[in-house]
Amino acid sequence: MSMRIPKAASVNDEQHQRIIKYGRALVLDIVEQYGGGHPGSAMGAMAIGIALWKYTLKYAPNDPNYFNRDRFVLSNGHVCLFQYIFQHLYGLKSMTMAQLKSYHSNDFHSLCPGHPEIEHDAVEVTTGPLGQGISNSVGLAIATKNLAATYNKPGFDIITNKVYCMVGDACLQEGPALESISLAGHMGLDNLIVLYDNNQVCCDGSVDIANTEDISAKFKACNWNVIEVENASEDVATIVKALEYAQAEKHRPTLINCRTVIGSGAAFENHCAAHGNALGEDGVRELKIKYGMNPAQKFYIPQDVYDFFKEKPAEGDKLVAEWKSLVAKYVKAYPEEGQEFLARMRGELPKNWKSFLPQQEFTGDAPTRAAARELVRALGQNCKSVIAGCADLSVSVNLQWPGVKYFMDPSLSTQCGLSGDYSGRYIEYGIREHAMCAIANGLAAYNKGTFLPITSTFFMFYLYAAPAIRMAGLQELKAIHIGTHDSINEGENGPTHQPVESPALFRAMPNIYYMRPVDSAEVFGLFQKAVELPFSSILSLSRNEVLQYPGKSSAEKAQRGGYILEDAENAEVQIIGVGAEMEFAYKAAKILGRKFRTRVLSIPCTRLFDEQSIGYRRSVLRKDGRQVPTVVVDGHVAFGWERYATASYCMNTYGKSLPPEVIYEYFGYNPATIAKKVEAYVRACQRDPLLLHDFLDLKEKPNHDKVNKL
């Protein structure tokens, strides 16, 4: 059964009502001025805001990045006016009334974008795509649990913060939210409190046009503590009481199901029109008259409303001072752990982190995933910032280091005997790829550099997580994603598991570094680069063994994104090899070398290559000062290679269920076949140089391919 909180008494009910009413009027004024925005839920949630920022949250308006602050995440990010207005009321210096009025304006420097953005004060993560924020919140809660279990000592609870997340009806319809809710309950994250703005209205009408399940029962089934509050658009005291119960809960996260009214008090209350529309001048005037306000006054907050929050900056200063004093004493009492903690607060890895990594590259044939495995294991074993995990494919990806401890609810007893606690740094995410990467974003956002999240699964399944990876790029958050079993060499599992189109998507995402190394030397260089970059990276790795290129491939050169693997003076043709398919490119180049001066290039990361000087890029692609026929050989689609090559020998259909050694033959990845096609192309370009500008597809589709049956 859910806990239903009876109405609580409060001596401040009258003042609460004034704040709620003036807050609603301010929302309407702000939205009205530019004729757009999302007023409804911001109006309906005003009582929740008072309960949070007046009575519950630990925060410091003068130091919004205070390390041990409670984190608040607005998962239903379109309700951002709710958050901005309370930032203004509680005294966040940057959130002036002028800034509030810049919402939906053409002001380039507005701090009030249409959805909250991480670069602004007191915003923990960028939200907007529904379901992301609650997943990020699970990551933030994991971060807190792990830091507390790692560093807290008797008498020195230096990490005590909680995570509060507000969600709406639509958030709870999204897949990643449900994945994260399930995992949070399984982990027993009792430091996570979710407030559900339950107004039962969506864009197209009432929520029951699409959803009729019992949300509280769903959370209960996922091992959440559930508290229900009626009249949550008005009753501040009862929400505060619910939050107190939630804070006291041990062993489970808490959902506070707050029954609210969208557009409260206005003509469009309880109607979908309140979601994303201005009310209109007559409607705003009507609400102000109803509330006993001067309808001519716009953007007005009376002094007594400001006074209600006036102690919050001083309270925050005291909180910060006391915490800093506690940390100073901790550092004296535990100098080794203390210095390590301070370094992590600064976002620093151990200064000697590179020395943890293996120094010897593989000499024999080996999958590129094997090299990445050794690197992750070495870094994870020696660096507490690393928190790795996998989407139920640890047996294939195999990143666990010797002595690894799992991040798990310590009370959990599994049938297979696996156990752990909150100091563990390896997470079994289950088949929840989207949540995994969104949770990694939360870990990365806790405090930049305090955690280095590393996720892993088959490369194909990062497609499930693409929205979360995009959000990492948007927020400039750093995680390393280990995608194994890439290209068609994934093999017998067939085209459902062969990610022929995925690299094009991830290469297109700003601030995401897609890396596909050809051998262990490149893996070593690119993994090191991924650790150094301030952005997220995806290492796309082979299932099968690949050739090594000693004396030719280079860890250092790979960090520049592209280089000449094997040179030929005054080359007549160039072959770009990528990942596991470099073997075919390299061997085809040897055959071509009998007739043409042939150069072999490796371009494992186009984004890194694009960041090099134009002089360097020309020295690789046009070493002889002229464009020569350049053919890329890749086991994925050619889309995007037009910038670097003049023709492709790439996948132009989906894959097929065949063993790796057979599937390449089936799709024509044969050195002799490739050499024959490239030779014909070179001779055609000699006859018609304009072909160099047409980016031709040199690979034929298999005769038995489904496409050719149409």
Curated annotation (Swiss-Prot):
Cross-referenced Gene3D superfamilies: 3.40.50.920, 3.40.50.970
Residues annotated as catalytic: 433
A GO cellular component annotation in the UniProt record: cytosol
Reaction catalysed by this enzyme: D-xylulose 5-phosphate + formaldehyde = dihydroxyacetone + D-glyceraldehyde 3-phosphate
Positions with a binding annotation for Mg(2+): 169, 199, 201
Binding residue positions for thiamine diphosphate: 78, 128-130, 199, 275, 433, 461
Pfam families associated with the record: Transket_pyr, Transketolase_C_1, Transketolase_N
Database matches in SMART domains: Transket_pyr (SM00861)
CDD domains the record matches: TPP_PYR_DXS_TK_like (cd07033), TPP_TK (cd02012)
Name under which the protein is recorded: Dihydroxyacetone synthase
